[in-house]
Each structure stands twice: as structure tokens, then as C-alpha cells.
A protein has these predicted regions:
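Iron-associated oxidoreductase/ferritin-like identity signal
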Residues: 1-187
Length: 187
């Protein structure tokens, strides 16, 4: 792989990441789970910030634009949901949706970590040490997000996706991510 191909693939993956987090934010907003919604709004902003930094790095260090890759819509939201209103979602549907959403998030972050680690290795193999170090920062960031997503998944499994547990953490998560977004916006 060339440096250009590596950055092109990373950029496309980040665009898809923004799409996934935006769709998960709508997914949870529709389910009236505002803590989870706020979580994915935050991660969408982070993903966009990392993508901008990636583009800026490539332009400033390689003096080129990153070529675009076709990006497939991740279709996180089931098409059947578009026929319903929020108040028509029953408890079992909500529980199953939370389970599916968390599993998608963990799978996405796992895939992302693998891609970033491979990009790091490939850049080192090409002798692009500085670029590899830039990507190493992304590996560490996604590793932290994956740890958080996996812990959330384990907690929900332990609680057997109890609707009481799910609803009980929404206010805390909403406020916590609201504060994180305020801090994020200052930088």
C-alpha cells in the first residue's frame, strides 16, 4: 500500500464513522434514550475532529489532497422504524434495539482499532515514522472508546438489558456527555 492509499482508506473509514455515530444518535433519540443519544453525538463530533486532523496532516505533510473513496451508507436504523412514532415502541423492542445498537458500536470500534493498527504498521514499513506516530494517536483514542463501549456492553449484559437499568442511566449519561461536549467545544 502507498501512503496515499492508507490515508484514503482511513479517511473513508472516518467518514463512515461519523455516519454511524450520527445514525446511532438518531436511533437512540427515537427510542427516547437521551443519554445514549448524547454519547453518539459526542463521538460523532470526535470522529469529525479526527478526520479533519487527518486531512490537515496529509495536506500539510504530503502537499496533496486525500482522494475520496466510495462510502456505503451503514444503515444503522432498521427501515421498518420509519413507519412508527416514538410512543409506539414497546419495551421489548427497546431492549432488543439497545442490545443491537451496543453490539454495532462495539463491532465498529473493534474494526476501527484493527484498521488503525494496520495503518500504523504499514506506514512504519514504508519508513513513514512521523505519519505512523500520528496514526498511533488515533489507535490510542479508539482503544479508549472501545474500552468504554465494551464496558457499557458488559454492564448491559450483566443487567440482562433491563429496561429499568437502561432508563436509570440516561439522565447521568446525558449530563456527563453534555459536559464533555461543552469542554470539547472550548478546544
Amino acid at each position: 500500500m502507498t501512503v496515499e492509499e492508507i490515508f484514503r482508506d482511513l479517511s473513508a473509514h472516518m467518514v463512515k464513522g461519523v455516519m454511524i455515530h450520527e445514525q446511532l444518535a438518531d436511533y437512540y433519540d427515537f427510542l427516547n434514550l437521551h443519554g445514549y443519544k448524547r454519547c453518539h453525538e459526542y463521538h460523532s463530533k470526535c470522529e469529525m475532529k479526527y478526520m479533519r486532523k487527518l486531512h490537515r496532516y496529509f495536506i500539510n505533510h504530503y502537499n496533496k489532497l486525500i482522494e475520496e473513496n466510495p462510502i456505503e451508507n451503514p444503515d444503522v436504523i432498521p427501515s421498518s422504524w420509519y413507519r412508527y412514532k416514538r410512543d409506539e415502541v414497546d419495551v421489548n423492542t427497546k431492549r432488543n434495539a439497545v442490545k443491537a445498537g451496543i453490539e454495532k458500536w462495539v463491532a465498529w470500534e473493534t474494526e476501527t482499532k484493527t484498521l488503525y493498527e494496520q495503518a500504523y504498521i504499514d506506514l512504519l514499513d514504508l519508513g513513514e515514522v512521523a505519519a505512523a506516530k500520528k496514526i498511533a494517536c488515533y489507535v490510542c483514542a479508539v482503544d479508549r472508546e472501545l474500552k468504554w463501549a465494551q464496558r457499557k456492553h458488559i454492564n448491559l449484559v450483566t443487567a440482562d438489558y433491563s429496561i429499568s437499568y437502561i432508563l436509570g442511566e440516561q439522565d447521568y449519561l446525558h449530563d456527563w456527555y453534555k459536559d464533555k461536549m461543552k469542554h470539547y467545544d472550548k478546544h
